[in-house]
Amino acid sequence: MALALCRMSHSPLLNLPGPRLDLLDEVHAAIAEAAEFVRAYDPDLVVIFSPDHYNGFFYRAMHPFCIGMYASAVGDYGTHIGALDVPTDLAADCAKAVLGADVDVAVSASMDVDHGTVQPLEKLFGTATARPVIPIFINAIAAPLGPLRRCRALGTAVGTFLSTLDLRVLVIGSGGLSHSPPVPTLHSADPQVRERIVHGQPLTPAQRQARQTVVMEAAKSFAAGNSDLQPLNPAWDQRFLEIIDNGHLSDLDRWSNSFVTHEGGSLAHEIRTWISAFAAMAVAGPYQTKVRYYKQAADLIAGFAIRTAVPIP
């Protein structure tokens, strides 16, 4: 087995008008550097740890973790719509191995994924279907959330399974860092929205357009400093990245969910995908990060970060 990693933030605003062109140029240049790393590595298989934003997973049965044996993209924010190339038998074997490692994970033979999964695939490969991919959902939005150490355990179990394969595997993690965009919660949503995030009715084109408009307006206000959204926290982001870069993943076990929310915002819990991805990478031994990028990107409502990593020879 060969193993490499690429971790990157995502933002629907990368696909929408509004962000400053100089910021987009800088972010896209960093993504291009990561994409070149991926191109040179040329993986046979991709495993992506990613969240969802009430497009595929809902409160009617909100799993902490779920491995997709089939997946289809919903096409939000201009991303790919339709089936991904999921190797069903291999995904099922991965789930069996993870369960055998005492990590409770659900499986799905009909997983819907959104931009949190698809955007990194498109940015790194050009298309979302360029490589076989096993999608692994991590709940990072719908409270109650489990402790961060369970995300590390998930990643270790997945990495142990990957170590048995005679394949070149790229592990991707998607999301983070500090950000608190306008996403509904079970307790704050109005009755119509609450019904949708519980029971999962698909958005109509008009509803999806309205949601997109809300995000664009929120980003405009946030970048102008006229927003009630929780500010970004670059100091906290850098602290997290330092822990990741140094391979001290167990240090994050001490971070409570309330601490993550207080310091990083409501969706900073997407760092869970980073923890799982780097824990999978660590199964191959000590690693070194290569591409390192961070930007306090108010226009994207995110502390936007990218890391690539390979095992230390």
Curated annotation (Swiss-Prot):
Class of this enzyme: oxidoreductase
Entry annotated with the keyword Iron: yes
Cofactor(s) annotated in UniProt: Fe(2+)
Catalytic activity: 3-(2,3-dihydroxyphenyl)propanoate + O2 = (2Z,4E)-2-hydroxy-6-oxonona-2,4-dienedioate + H(+); (2E)-3-(2,3-dihydroxyphenyl)prop-2-enoate + O2 = (2Z,4E,7E)-2-hydroxy-6-oxonona-2,4,7-trienedioate + H(+)
Catalytic site positions: 115 (proton donor), 179 (proton acceptor)
Domain of life: Bacteria
Chain's role: Catalyzes the non-heme iron(II)-dependent oxidative cleavage of 2,3-dihydroxyphenylpropionic acid and 2,3-dihydroxicinnamic acid into 2-hydroxy-6-ketononadienedioate and 2-hydroxy-6-ketononatrienedioate, respectively.
Species name: Mycobacterium ulcerans (strain Agy99)
Gene3D superfamilies from the UniProt entry: LigB-like (3.40.830.10)
Entry EC no(s): 1.13.11.16
Protein name in UniProt: 2,3-dihydroxyphenylpropionate/2,3-dihydroxicinnamic acid 1,2-dioxygenase
Pfam families with a match to the protein in the record: LigB
InterPro entries with a match to the protein in the record: DHPP/DHXA_dioxygenase (IPR023789), Xdiol_dOase_suB (IPR004183)
Family in the record: Belongs to the LigB/MhpB extradiol dioxygenase family.
GO process annotations (BP): 3-phenylpropionate catabolic process
Oligomeric and partner information: Homotetramer.
Biological pathway: Aromatic compound metabolism; 3-phenylpropanoate degradation
Signal peptide coordinates: none
Gene: mhpB
GO molecular function: 3-carboxyethylcatechol 2,3-dioxygenase activity; ferrous iron binding
Keywords carried by this UniProt record: Aromatic hydrocarbons catabolism, Dioxygenase, Iron, Oxidoreductase
